[in-house]
Amino acid sequence: MPTVLSRMAMQLKKTAWIIPVFMVSGCSLSPAIPVIGAYYPSWFFCAIASLILTLITRRVIQRANINLAFVGIIYTALFALYAMLFWLAFF
């Protein structure tokens, strides 16, 4: 009667082929967007949109007279959040 560890080892052998698939899934061409004859990476547009949204958020927070602690960390986190959301939504 197989033990729990031997059953787990058999399952791992059955699914071991998946690991190389995930390792090479990022080896495709990078998404580039042509703008006036030049190709720019899509992360560049996500960063620009994220910067604009972060500045808008900063303006809203300033107009609401909200004082934030750790401003640098908060705006950096907002920038990263917006960039990842744009990447997820559009690419």
Swiss-Prot record:
This protein's UniProt keywords: Cell membrane, Lipoprotein, Membrane, Palmitate, Signal, Transmembrane, Transmembrane helix
Domain of life (superkingdom): Bacteria
One Pfam family here: Ytca
Subcellular location, record wording: Cell membrane; Membrane
Protein's membrane topology: Lipid-anchor; Multi-pass membrane protein
Residues that span the membrane, as ranges: 33-53, 70-90
Residues with a covalently attached lipid (S-diacylglycerol cysteine): 27
Signal peptide per UniProt: 1-26
GO cellular component term of the entry, any: plasma membrane
Residues with a covalently attached lipid (N-palmitoyl cysteine): 27
InterPro entries per the UniProt record, alphabetical: YtcA
Record bears the keyword Phosphoprotein: no
Family: Belongs to the YtcA family.
Protein name (Swiss-Prot/TrEMBL): Uncharacterized protein YtcA
Organism of provenance: Escherichia coli (strain K12)
Lineage of origin: Bacteria, Pseudomonadati, Pseudomonadota, Gammaproteobacteria, Enterobacterales
